[in-house]
Amino acid sequence: MAAGLAITSEGGQYNGRMTSFVALSCMMAAMGGVIFGYDIGVSGGVTSMDPFLKKFFPDVYRKMKEDTEISNYCKFDSQLLTSFTSSLYVAGLVASFFASSVTRAFGRKPSILLGGXVFLAXAALGGAAVNVYMLIFGRVLLGVGVGFANQAVPLYLSEMAPPRYRGAINNGFQFSVGIGALSANLINYGTEKIEGGWGWRISLAMAAVPAAILTFGALFLPETPNSLIQRSNDHERAKLMLQRVRGTTDVQAELDDLIKASIISRTIQHPFKNIMRRKYRPQLVMAVAIPFFQQVTGINVIAFYAPILFRTIGLEESASLLSSIVTGLVGSASTFISMLIVDKLGRRALFIFGGVQMFVAQIMVGSIMAAELGDHGGIGKGYAYIVLILICIYVAGFGWSWGPLGWLVPSEIFPLEIRSAGQSIVVAVSFLFTFVVAQTFLSMLCHFKSGIFFFFGGWVVVMTAFVHFLLPETKKVPIEKMDIVWRDHWFWKKIIGEEAAEENNKMEAA
């Protein structure tokens, strides 16, 4: 059963509709976002639970409870504690490069399946952990699972989606991340109240639920037409899949573009080497800059350490976990709004509006903490809740801009021949700087104090200017015709030069 409108775009015209088949397939694949979000949300919650700290990080617990001389900003400063959070991202960084080869050679579906299965094993290990080494090894396995899922799922969504709805469908990945984080916050809030001090085990083990859904569901996922054509000469099979995906038999124009892209793809033996060529310079810059900027918004500081941050400003354990639920709800709601408007307003407008909103909120939070929170004692409850409101405003700005668009834009800009390699670079850069931010934040909070918010606010100014000057609009442009936006851009057309134009002319003549 198909529903929707004909797909048209500035870059060309394809026939087709948004089908229930595509919607269900993308919903299942987007469970890869849920496992990622759950893991982001659960770590901050359990590290604020007293029984968890007493068992695995007794030095942190002692500083928090007994050492009255330690600054509010330094109570949680522990490299071992941050290693628990950040170890996942080192593993994910390494895994993403292996995932690139699997995704290119065997398809998007096997990478999603493998990611779900490894994540499932790690969730079991984390819930059963008896020492800190077992705990961190479980996090490493979770990182491998997330590395494979994050490499394959955004590609899957972009390739399955009609151009008209690609933004909304791909933003479903970030929406799923938000749902996962919110679920973790709700579970943390409930398990913290369990008597006996073992609630953290439930929090960690519950990650197995979305992982099991993803693993089982991946068995039934169809492969994308792009991947079928890239990996074989069976164009008839790809055509049948494309007809099913688009809900129409008239898919020849899109099929021809996929075949042309595949011909170029097969001439590329070393995609990581070829992505360095001048003709791919815009995509390479975006593959590095966008995930880097996404991390230095400071959002994962809120996601990882929100309960710790709220305890720093004087909220109790339950109140800090409840505050994390509030920010999670705001983030999920704003990402859902982004899904509805991204293909109407475009990517650039949301990036810029969200950047301004985040900057204002961060500066105000930093100012309040600088004025009201000293090294000892808390701040008034009134100010604490003002900080919470401002953080919600900041999270909302991220939720409809850099959150979903940080995954959407990189996944839609790469030509087929370097798409898998390009997405691996995106994931690796994201994990690298997530690791750096996660590993250094508690120390930075200790040394910068309230200045940490001004630090991240400065980066928001830089990234907003970057988008304004260097990112072209990509809404509704077919994914295999995306080279048009670079050839027409005032700056990038000077960079890619004649090489890209000549090769494009050859492809069109083929």
From Swiss-Prot:
Q: Which domain of life is it from?
A: Eukaryota
Keywords tagged on the record = Membrane, Sugar transport, Symport, Transmembrane, Transmembrane helix, Transport
The subcellular localization recorded is: Membrane
Quote the protein name from its UniProt record.
Hexose carrier protein HEX6
Taken from the UniProt entry, a GO cellular component term is: membrane
Q: Which NCBIfam families match?
A: SP
Question: One Pfam match, by short name?
Answer: Sugar_tr
Family according to the record: Belongs to the major facilitator superfamily. Sugar transporter (TC 2.A.1.1) family.
Q: What does this protein do?
A: Active uptake of hexoses. Probable glucose/hydrogen symport.
Show the InterPro entries listed in the entry: MFS_dom (IPR020846), MFS_STP/MST-like_plant (IPR044778), MFS_sugar_transport-like (IPR005828), MFS_trans_sf (IPR036259), STP/PLT_plant (IPR045262), Sugar/inositol_transpt (IPR003663), Sugar_transporter_CS (IPR005829)
- Regions crossing the membrane: 23-43, 83-103, 118-128, 140-160, 169-189, 202-222, 284-304, 325-345, 349-369, 382-402, 428-448, 451-471
Q: How does it sit in the membrane?
A: Multi-pass membrane protein
Any one Gene Ontology MF annotation carried by this entry is: symporter activity
List residues in topological domain: Cytoplasmic: 1-22, 472-510
